[in-house]
């Protein structure tokens, strides 16, 4: 499994259980653990692929710190973008991530999410977990970075086996911008083309 498909498996386990109020700042480990336990009941055999994809999109839009992640992945180019470009990029980034990961939902094959602990993070908490595969083998370590936004946790990054998905995405976007002569508009145009008529609004 790729890092994206492994991460998608983790998302699938919590997607159906998540709601904006569910990430209220309590015990961070309990938040992720409880969501994982509840999600499997919702994402049963009766859920269609389209329903699962829609739930993932809702998850990302409501419970991730989308503006903060968007600024991070754009890196130094955020400051060179106009306010209009920044606004469009945040929306396109939201749609793009939902599209990319919802397309990976078929990779889920019964993995289980096990929370192993939590510790304070720079802006909130870091919840450690493992993806346990039904076929056996070593578990995959997944860390959820949570930011406390006025008493509510927002997910700001997810690291799979120590690899930050936000950092990985920033590198990919930087390469696109560099190929566009250092212009953010080149990335915006590409994201616009990839997400056109692909993500329900």
Question: What are the roles of these predicted feature ranges?
Answer:
Residues 93, 117-119, 131-133, 144-146, ...:
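A mature extracytoplasmic/lumenal domain signature
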């Amino acid at each position: 499994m790729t890092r994206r498909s492994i991460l998608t498996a983790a998302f699938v386990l919590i997607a159906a259980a998540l709601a904006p109020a569910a990430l209220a700042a309590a015990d961070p480990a309990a938040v992720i653990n409880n969501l994982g336990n509840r999600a499997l009941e919702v994402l049963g055999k009766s859920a269609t692929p389209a329903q699962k994809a829609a739930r993932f999109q809702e998850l990302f839009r409501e419970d991730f710190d989308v503006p903060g992640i968007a600024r991070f992945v754009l890196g130094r180019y955020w400051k060179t973008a106009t306010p209009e470009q920044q606004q469009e990029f945040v929306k396109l980034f939201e749609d793009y991530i939902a599209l990319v990961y919802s397309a990976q939902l078929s990779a889920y094959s019964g993995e289980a999410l096990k929370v192993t602990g939590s510790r304070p993070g720079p802006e909130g908490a870091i919840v450690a977990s493992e993806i346990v595969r039904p076929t056996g083998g070593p578990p995959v370590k997944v860390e959820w970075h949570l930011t406390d936004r006025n008493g509510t946790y927002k997910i700001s990054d997810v690291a799979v086996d120590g690899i930050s998905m936000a950092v990985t995405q920033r590198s990919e976007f930087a390469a696109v911008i560099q190929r566009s002569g250092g212009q953010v508009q080149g990335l915006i145009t590409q994201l616009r083309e990839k997400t056109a008529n692909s993500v329900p609004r």
